């Protein structure tokens, strides 16, 4: 599987059971204090509201969908991996195959399903672009490159941009929030 460097993805993080809220708070504080807001974006505890009827009274409870897990939206770099991995209460990333190895991201369909169940939405970005328009890539390995939009995949929030590399036009896949229309 070819993982695009610099792409924003969702990862599952394993925590001590019952520490999900603490991990979320700790991680959000660490992101701010360590200036990681450009690499670590959202921390979500998968939970859903449940109504229980007890003694004839309806009571709403918030139940954790996946106890012991927190979802983190980030760009996987050595720094972001280190910050999350070393947050108090975190035992590790789900999907990493051993010491020091980087984890696999969650599939976009899985994330959409979980967020939809919670009543949240994946960030939607309204970009009015057409094939052939000029854009500037703002982040990632091709930051500050100017290119021409070749293909738009609205359902995946991605587009293919032709950039000039070493005198040749090269297609580069980027996310909507990584570009700026010229």
UniProtKB/Swiss-Prot annotation:
What Pfam families does this protein map onto?
Answer: KOW (PF00467), NusG (PF02357)
| PROSITE patterns assigned | NUSG
The keyword Hydrolase belongs to this UniProt entry's keyword annotation: no
Q: Which domain of life is it from?
A: Bacteria
The record's listing under CDD domains reads: KOW_NusG, NGN_Bact_1
Keywords annotated in UniProt = Transcription, Transcription antitermination, Transcription regulation, Transcription termination
Provide GO CC annotations from the record.
Answer: cytosol
Residue ranges of domain KOW in the record: 131-163
**So what family is this one in?**
Belongs to the NusG family.
Entry protein name? Transcription termination/antitermination protein NusG
Species name: Staphylococcus epidermidis (strain ATCC 35984 / DSM 28319 / BCRC 17069 / CCUG 31568 / BM 3577 / RP62A)
The taxonomy runs: Bacteria, Bacillati, Bacillota, Bacilli, Bacillales
